[in-house]
Amino acid sequence: MVQDVPFFSQLSEGIDLGCRHCHYYLNISYIYENDDIETLLSEWKRLGAKGILLLGTEMEKHDIKPFTRCGLPVVLIDNYFEALNLDCVTINNLQGAYLATDYLIKQTHAQPGYLHSSYIITGFEERADGFYKAIRKNGMSTSRSVVHHLSPTVDGAYCDMKAVIKSGDELARCYFADNDLIAAGAMRALSEAGYRIPEDISVIGFDDMPMCTYITPPLSTVHVPKQYMGEIAVKRLAEIINSTSASHVKIEISTEIIKRKSC
């Protein structure tokens, strides 16, 4: 089961490759808020499903529990819950945010600000941990970082950042953004207000979406190997299907900085 999120296309390519390699047939289902999960799970089992890849980016613990009781092997992708015994393949969000923030500091020699998502999910909170860790490691005070809470979409972040600028709130010399969409929207608002990027304000994003190369200037960001992430998730699911072991694992996919022109 997957939800429709921005990196779904590349992730699904990896899942498809992994399934073909393991000789599994892939069926993609979309689940919506009002769907009866128990009924869907029963139907999948009736149709002979061997396992479930669950893209849980925006899911909470109570959303996951029906899958842990369904009797089928499950691998959770892009989320993790310490209280649930469940295999997962996730992004090393803390590492990525740390690398991005550390790079910002070394490029600008300035206290970084944070374009933080106003919509809270596990991944963004892990990125917040990485952001503040980099600040502490560079001998800076976390309390001095300017934080703006912006909608995690291009249009939403653009409108929110316009409001921040109009209010006269303090702006930072450089910003780490929770994702590329927030970065793109904020950059547009800053540019329209007369700020030059990166000469006046530097910005770095997270996810390395295709749009990054089309933004002016091209957006520096954190690359997540989404296709590889999908392949690894299938490999782990196949191991569970073919094993009697009850041990669960958490696999974190490492990230890397992509240096472009925004910082």
Residue map of PLM features:
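Alpha-helical recognition/docking segments in bacterial nutrient-uptake
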Residues: 1-99, 165-166
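Hinge/beta->alpha junction and helix N-cap segments in small-molecule ligand-binding domains
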Residues: 1-10, 28-37, 89-99, 115-162, ...
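Short glycine/serine/threonine/alanine-rich loop segments
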Residues: 23-24, 72, 110, 140, ...
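Periplasmic-binding protein-like
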Residues: 49-56, 113-116, 147, 169-179, ...
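Glycine-rich phosphate/diphosphate-binding loops that line cofactor/substrate pockets in enzymes
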Residues: 103-112
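Flexible loop/turn connectors
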Residues: 160-263
